[in-house]
Amino acid sequence: MIAGIKAPDSTIARQAEQYAREYSSDVLFNHVMRCYFFGELFARKRGVKVDHELMFVSAVLHDLGFTEAGKGPHRFEVEGAHAARKFLLDQGVQEDRAWQVWHNIALHVGDLNLFKDEPTRVMQQGILYDLTALPPDLALDPNNVAEVLHHYPRLGFKKGFLEIFTAELDSKKPYPHRFHLCSCIEHHRSHALNIPKPEDFLGSAPFAD
């Protein structure tokens, strides 16, 4: 029990956590676990009913694309979604449920998950809370946050996560990701589009490291 939240104890939840633990560094594993608990805290704060198992599996497997389990030529969130779906199907999870997890993971980079159903939105907010500054109305109880950090410390996450991204970019040249067409047009048309430095994006998170 962490901050009044108990992670699901189903067979597939335990298997997913073990799989993420096996392939992830300490920095990455602690990140995905924090994301789950932060998402649950947002769900509790907003009174949103969630499928706890689906949210847990989606959260703990969402960065497999940075690991050996999700190696491949495509960008990391797509490779991670493929790896998670294959893992779930291999464990006997139903096809439609495995696809739900695929969508949650493949769309977690950017803002698309924030426009989906409420359970997906709070899961995405949990991920974003660990990464960057969020509006004041999305603040969480500091005592609950501290309890999550006690169990899953950040271990220099801001620097460590940037290094993980750098290694991902170095492994795939040219990187297989395209800017949104509207972003490209606005950048070349007005040169006013703000593209933040990664150090500023990650550095804005409300944590020391």
Where are the regions that the model predicts?
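Short coil/turn segments at secondary-structure boundaries
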Residues: 67-75, 92-93
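Divalent metal-dependent phosphate-bond-processing catalytic cores, especially two-metal-ion Mg2+/Mn2+ enzymes
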Residues: 2-3, 23-48, 93, 110-209
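Inter-helical turn/loop segments and adjacent helix faces that build the functional surface
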Residues: 84, 88-97, 136-137
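An active-site-proximal "capping" alpha-helix that borders the catalytic cofactor pocket
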Residues: 35-37, 75-90
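Active-site flanking loop/helix segments enriched in acidic
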Residues: 13-31, 63-67
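Short alpha-helical hairpin
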Residues: 1-17
